[in-house]
């Protein structure tokens, strides 16, 4: 089955209807899951005919892929446009990341992708490339501004895991509802921890260190 979200050649499609379809798909699939959510339900939610959906998206799988890409749009990268020093931008980025992934729809999206891992294996890769991989690359870039660039990729991976920590697992598993203050504490602890690692700081570890308030 093709997963291309491109319309058939020769058709001029209304971008407003495409946006409405994606919003309808978001509501249906986040409520019912990818397997149980139907195209009929998406059409009703979006206020369009089912044939209109298929003019924009060749299949249900193509619609699911387009929705995942849209929901992984890198809004978390907003702090990069700030004029703050790199350490503060890094902290802001991690706070934005935590707030984003802890949102109800983000948690539902992650659960839905895991649930479909066997049936739609490409979905996990799409999610990874559209979201987590980009975030880690930007964290590595920020870290490298003041630290050893060679360690930046592994530091970025560890910072994400430490910043989200057990609080995110509780959200995904439905065993708790940690608030933003929990994530903020985890983030500050994570930043303090990596700053204590001389190798992560690189050859200039004995010199002035970046100032991050913990």
State what each model feature region is.
Residues 1-16, 198-214:
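N-terminal intrinsically disordered/low-complexity leader segments
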Residues 1-48, 56, 61-62:
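Basic, helix-initiating cap at the start of DNA-binding domains
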Residues 31, 65-94, 99-101:
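Amphipathic alpha-helical linker/stalk segments
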Residues 51:
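Key DNA-contact positions within bacterial/archaeal DNA-binding proteins
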Residues 59, 116-121, 165:
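Short loop-to-helix capping motifs
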Residues 88, 104-108, 121-147, 153-157, ...:
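Amphipathic alpha-helical packing segments from all-alpha helical-bundle domains
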Residues 95-102, 110-119, 190-194:
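Helix-loop "lid/cap" segments that line or gate small-molecule binding pockets
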Residues 144-191, 202-205, 209-214:
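Hydrophobic/aromatic-rich alpha-helical bundle segments in the mid-to-C-terminal region
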């Amino acid at each position: 089955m093709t997963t291309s979200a491109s319309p058939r050649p020769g058709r001029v499609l209304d971008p407003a209807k495409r946006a409405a379809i994606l919003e309808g798909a978001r509501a249906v699939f986040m409520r019912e899951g990818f397997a149980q959510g139907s195209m009929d339900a998406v059409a009703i939610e979006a206020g369009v005919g089912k044939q209109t959906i298929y003019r924009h998206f060749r299949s249900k799988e193509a619609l699911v892929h387009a929705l995942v890409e849209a929901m992984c749009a890198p809004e978390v990268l907003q702090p990069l446009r700030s004029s703050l020093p790199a350490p503060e931008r890094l902290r802001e980025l991690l706070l934005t990341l935590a707030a984003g992934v802890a949102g109800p729809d983000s948690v539902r999206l992650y659960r839905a992708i895991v649930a479909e891992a066997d049936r739609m294996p490409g979905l996990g890769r799409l999610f990874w490339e559209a979201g987590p991989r980009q975030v880690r690359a930007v964290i590595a870039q920020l870290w490298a501004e003041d630290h050893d660039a060679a360690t930046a990729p592994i530091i970025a991976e560890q910072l994400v895991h430490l910043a989200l920590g057990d609080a995110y697992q509780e959200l995904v598993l439905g065993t708790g509802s940690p608030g933003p203050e929990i994530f903020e504490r985890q983030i500050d602890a994570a930043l303090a921890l990596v700053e204590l690692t001389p190798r992560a700081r690189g050859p200039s570890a004995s010199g002035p260190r970046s100032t991050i308030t913990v």
